[in-house]
């Protein structure tokens, strides 16, 4: 079994380091630190706040925790605890007071820093997270994050902030699953969105956009219940089109095309039900043909490769002429076929 203090600190520690820009949250005044400052200056004569409330026990001394059934126990016989417990910081200030019903955390409780400022506000019903949880940075009373729960599952909005009050992440949950709009922001760049994504019950669903630090779209994608669906667009950092793709429920369907920065085609290919179909081509930067392949149901029917000067360096499956020779053989040798006229009798 584990001590109570360890359990509380572990839960807080998971989230304390995760924090950019839906608008700053107003800071409360810094009067919360006054109590801690006075304690620090007069620590010899400071009064211990714990142990003054009748029926409230010391969490660390009187209670133990059974993690197998998430129950806090008291006494030699280890019965589920009913009542309140508290802990104090080394400077004598109350750290937290928690209520229990049948060994389960129940109700709203508040934990403070040693400065006297609020660290976290939690809510439980019979040991299950339920309601709003809020974590604060020390001394500033600036919110670090807010999460909402319903019967143990994240439900509703979750939002994370920097110490300056800028949002880093905003998302919504439905019974523990991401649902609705999620916004992620560039770290340390105020009001600069990095990603805007839509979810339906845990699945990517709808528009998915990524932005660079200048606010320019660099990815414009679309999903349908977790699967790629529709047109995907990728862009250079200045917004110039880089690539387009077409998908139907995670299967390639239609043209895939990549562009040089100047706007002309670098390569293109077409898919039908996930298999390459028709002509696929790749071009040099000067627009000359580099590679050409003809597909039928995913199989290569013909293939040609060319060097930078336009000379063919490889061919496969080239169509044959009437005399049985491949037409491209003449092209390779620099000759051209001329039809001979029959003499009239």
Residue ranges and their predicted role:
Residues 1-25:
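Bacterial Sec-dependent N-terminal signal peptides
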Residues 18-345:
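Glycine/tyrosine- and acidic-biased, solvent-exposed loop/turn segments at the edges of beta-strands
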């Amino acid at each position: 079994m584990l001590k109570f203090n360890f359990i509380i600190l572990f839960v807080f520690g998971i989230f304390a380091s995760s924090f950019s820009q839906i608008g700053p949250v107003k800071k409360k005044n810094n009067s919360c630190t006054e109590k801690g400052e006075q304690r620090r200056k007069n620590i010899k004569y400071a009064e211990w706040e714990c142990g003054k409330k009748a029926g409230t026990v010391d969490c660390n001394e009187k209670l133990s925790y059974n993690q197998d059934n998430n129950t806090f126990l008291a006494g030699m016989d280890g019965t589920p605890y009913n009542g309140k417990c508290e802990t104090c910081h080394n400077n004598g200030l109350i750290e937290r007071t928690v209520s229990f019903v049948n060994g389960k955390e129940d109700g709203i409780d508040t934990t403070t820093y040693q400065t006297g400022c609020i660290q976290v506000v939690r809510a439980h019903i019979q040991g299950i997270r339920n309601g709003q949880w809020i974590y604060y940075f020390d001394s500033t009373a600036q919110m670090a994050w807010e999460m909402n729960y319903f019967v143990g599952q994240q439900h509703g909005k979750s939002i994370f902030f920097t110490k300056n009050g800028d949002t880093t992440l905003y998302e919504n949950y439905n019974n523990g699953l991401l649902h609705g709009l999620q916004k992620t922001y560039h770290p340390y760049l105020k009001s600069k969105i990095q990603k805007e994504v839509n979810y339906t019950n845990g699945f990517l669903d709808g528009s998915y956009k990524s932005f660079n630090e200048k606010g320019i779209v660099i990815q414009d994608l679309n999903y349908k219940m977790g699967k790629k669906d529709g047109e995907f667009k990728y862009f250079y950092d200045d917004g110039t089109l880089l690539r387009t793709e077409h998908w139907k429920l995670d299967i390639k369907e239609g043209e895939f095309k990549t562009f040089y920065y100047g706007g002309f085609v670098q390569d293109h290919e077409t898919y039908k039900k996930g298999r390459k179909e028709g002509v696929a081509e790749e071009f040099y930067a000067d627009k000359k043909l580099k590679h050409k392949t003809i597909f039928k149901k995913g199989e290569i029917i013909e293939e040609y490769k060319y060097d930078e000067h336009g000379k063919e360096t490889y061919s496969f499956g080239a169509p044959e002429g009437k005399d049985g020779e491949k037409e491209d053989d003449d092209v390779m040798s620099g000759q051209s076929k001329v039809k001979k006229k029959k003499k009239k009798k």
